[in-house]
């Protein structure tokens, strides 16, 4: 693993005065003429900018179609597209259950004789609709829909469905606590384990205060992952979470720094006292990206809080917002910290590389009731090369490393080498 990282690091330091790129981590989206107008006319760059702003901002969550219908007098832009992602991978070390998501917290011990596995996947392929009405007006209206094949038995599952009007975003998409544009680019569908990435029903208002300063505040649908015991039980949630952020951007938007926060109270039933109780949760995040020089840019985020496990990649499916304690009927929040840092280098307009490291730690209360296999901390390392043949076809290769340790001190390691072919239209 060290040799792999050193090789990529050395490559990234070469030619800083060469190709000058924006902070875009995915060179498949770099060209200004990536969207071809149909049944109407408008500058391709304008269509790209409008549809790109209407789509999710996470770098591996494509929502930019290659063709768009242009309404009369440019009253609307409508793009309907799809992306096929064919992936082949080889896993070695301990067992990584999913062929789609490389998640350190899900690593399980390898069975005797199962030291390696060759696997294939296509389920992260997607189709999407990106629509913006009155794109050159302050009253522009946007609708975005995206679905993948990640449901049970490869059924279609909606990953985003939301509308926009002026500064309002409402629907099923990322929480405002997620800084998608600050996440490093990965071929792995999951991405860095310590980053905030939560999709749910949300509504938030984003506002530009000046040319450089902006902010947002909203509400997220109330959810709670509570590890109850015999004296507690989950109840329906009543109070939505409140995410907000303040951001400063420069360099034409290629660099920014964002301070985010979230407040999320969660209710449960105290069976000992026959009444409902509340766990108070909340967290802060510092995130951003910066164009350093030439084709080199960096991304980072640092998150800390109580009862925010649902919002962190590695904790989102393991029920660790709050845990039962030795006091009957009493639950306490789990404290969590996530850290991510990544570098991107664009060698040419067609070839780019990304390397990253991410870490997540959970601190359980001293009187927590938890099994020895409860997730304590994990690490995630990824390095990739992505080559774009044209705006429709690209390919990439990536190495992923994951490490996890439970509260009993037992550790597991998993490795993956994967190649991806992407066809987008």
Which residues make up each language-model segment?
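N-terminal periplasmic/intermembrane-space "pro-region" immediately following the signal or transit peptide
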Residues: 2, 6-7, 15, 21-92
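Sequence/structural signature of outer-membrane beta-barrel proteins
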Residues: 89-91, 134, 148-152, 177-179, ...
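Surface-exposed loop/turn segments flanking beta-strands in extracellular/periplasmic regions
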Residues: 100-109, 319-326
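Surface-exposed extracellular loop regions of Gram-negative outer-membrane beta-barrel proteins
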Residues: 122-144, 245-270, 346, 351-358, ...
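Outer-membrane beta-barrel "beta-signal"
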Residues: 387-389, 412-425
């Amino acid at each position: 693993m060290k040799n792999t990282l050193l090789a990529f690091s050395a490559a990234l330091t070469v030619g800083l005065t060469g190709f000058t790129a924006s902070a875009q981590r995915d060179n498949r989206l770099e060209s200004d003429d990536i969207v071809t107008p149909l049944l109407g006319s408008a500058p391709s760059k304008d269509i790209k900018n409008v549809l790109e702003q209407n789509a999710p901002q996470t770098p591996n969550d494509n929502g930019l179609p290659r063709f768009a219908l242009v309404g009369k007098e440019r009253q609307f832009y409508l793009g309907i597209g799809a992306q096929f992602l064919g992936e082949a991978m080889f896993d070695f070390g301990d067992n990584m259950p999913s062929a789609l998501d490389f998640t350190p917290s899900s690593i399980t011990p390898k069975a005797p004789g199962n030291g390696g596995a060759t696997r294939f996947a296509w389920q992260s392929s997607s189709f999407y609709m990106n629509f913006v009405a009155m794109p050159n007006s302050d009253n522009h209206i946007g609708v975005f829909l995206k679905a993948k094949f990640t449901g049970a038995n490869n059924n279609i599952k909606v990953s985003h469905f939301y509308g926009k009007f002026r500064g309002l975003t409402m629907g099923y998409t990322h929480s405002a606590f997620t800084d998608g544009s600050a996440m490093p680019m990965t071929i792995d569908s999951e991405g860095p384990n310590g980053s905030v990435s939560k999709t749910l029903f949300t509504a938030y208002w984003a506002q530009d205060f000046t040319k450089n300063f902006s902010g947002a505040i909203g509400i997220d649908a109330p959810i709670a992952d509570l590890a109850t015991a015999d004296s507690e039980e989950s109840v329906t949630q009543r109070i939505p979470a409140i995410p907000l952020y303040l951001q400063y951007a420069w360099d034409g938007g290629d660099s920014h720094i964002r301070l985010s926060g979230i407040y999320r109270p969660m209710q449960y039933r105290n069976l000992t006292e026959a009444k409902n109780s509340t766990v108070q949760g909340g967290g802060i995040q510092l995130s951003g990206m910066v164009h350093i020089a030439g084709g080199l840019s960096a991304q980072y985020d640092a998150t800390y809080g109580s009862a925010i496990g649902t919002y962190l990649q590695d904790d989102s499916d393991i029920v660790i917002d709050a845990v039962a304690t030795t006091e009957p009927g009493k639950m306490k929040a789990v404290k969590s910290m996530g850290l991510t840092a990544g570098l991107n280098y664009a060698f040419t307009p067609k070839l780019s590389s990304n390397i990253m490291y991410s870490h997540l730690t959970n601190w359980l209360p001293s009187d927590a009731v938890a099994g020895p296999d409860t997730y304590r901390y994990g690490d995630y390392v990824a390095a990739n090369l992505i080559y774009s043949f044209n705006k429709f076809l690209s390919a990439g290769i990536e190495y992923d490393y994951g490490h996890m340790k439970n509260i009993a001190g037992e550790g597991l390691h998993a490795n993956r080498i994967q190649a991806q072919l992407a066809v987008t239209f």
